[in-house]
Amino acid sequence: MVVEDTPKSIITDDQITTNPNRVIEDDNNLEEGEILDEDDSSATSKPVVHQPHLLENSWTFLFDTPAAKSKQDDWGSSMRPIYTFSTVEEFWSIYNNIHHPGKLAVRADFYCFKHKIEPKWEDPICANGGKWTANYPKGKSDTSWLYTLLAMIGEQFDHGDEICGAVVKVRGRAEKISIWTKNASNEAAQVSIGKQWKEFLDYNETMGFIFHDDARKLDRNAKNKYVV
């Protein structure tokens, strides 16, 4: 598949760098009167060891396919984990080798959640939470999805401990990106997350926050409790 050009990321290039230190022979090893020539082939160098850049949290990509969902009665039972990553390098290795939202089939759901948190209302960490949602025309969410991932795994939110994960849902005429949080009743934290997310995405439309409990009881009739 063709990998899209990666836009300027929140995880900066200097976080993925090589070790500039080059080990050469110590001056004490020179013969008396010998001058060390830096280009001298006798100057030995050791291979550079690339240290992985650890993330503060481990994250898991999960995928729910349209075909699998049509065969299951219970919501979420067809969801499958793809890969759990804990370093910057692992993230890019996965991201650059998977389809982005614009290439996913209609009715596909693609998740990135903190490791061991399931993107389900029944998960004890998600149970009292809610979600912010940004809406996009079909095929227009790729860049915002990447920026959302980078903001989360790069711990760019002031209330990052409130975040469970994010999901992009591909539908017939639209794509929706949502950020799930833990404590819906913590208005200050939720509004802060919503405002920062809008800023990261340069999103100009209104965003709404729905409590999971309302969505569970009212389904499509659930109303926004917070807006930014």
Curated annotation (Swiss-Prot):
Changing W180A: Resistance to pea seed-borne mosaic virus (PSbMV) and altered translation activation. This is Eukaryotic translation initiation factor 4E-1. GO terms for cellular component: cytoplasm; eukaryotic translation initiation factor 4F complex; nucleus. Changing K169N: In strain: JI 2009, alleles susceptible and SBM1. In strain: Dark skinned Perfection. In strain: Bonneville. MRNA binds at residues 71-76, 103, 121-122, 171-176, 216-220. Keywords: Cytoplasm, Disulfide bond, Host-virus interaction, Initiation factor, Nucleus, Plant defense, Protein biosynthesis, RNA-binding, Translation regulation. Changing Q72A: Susceptibility to pea seed-borne mosaic virus (PSbMV) and normal translation activation. Changing E122A: Altered translation activation. GO terms for biological process: defense response to virus; regulation of translation; translational initiation. One of its GO terms (molecular function) is RNA 7-methylguanosine cap binding. SUPFAM superfamilies: eIF4e-like (SSF55418). According to the redox status, the Cys-126-Cys-164 disulfide bridge may have a role in regulating protein function by affecting its ability to bind capped mRNA. It comes from Pisum sativum (Garden pea). Changing V170A: Susceptibility to pea seed-borne mosaic virus (PSbMV) and normal translation activation. Changing S178E: Susceptibility to pea seed-borne mosaic virus (PSbMV) and altered translation activation. The keyword Secreted does not apply. Changing S70A: Resistance to pea seed-borne mosaic virus (PSbMV) and normal translation activation. Its main location: nucleus. InterPro entries: TIF_eIF4e-like, TIF_eIF_4E, TIF_eIF_4E_CS. It comes from the Eukaryota. Changing L62W: In strain: JI 2009, alleles SBM1 and susceptible. In strain: Dark skinned Perfection. In strain: Brutus. Changing K176A: Susceptibility to pea seed-borne mosaic virus (PSbMV) and slightly reduced translation activation. Changing F113A: Partial susceptibility to pea seed-borne mosaic virus (PSbMV) and altered translation activation. Changing L201P: In strain: Dark skinned Perfection.
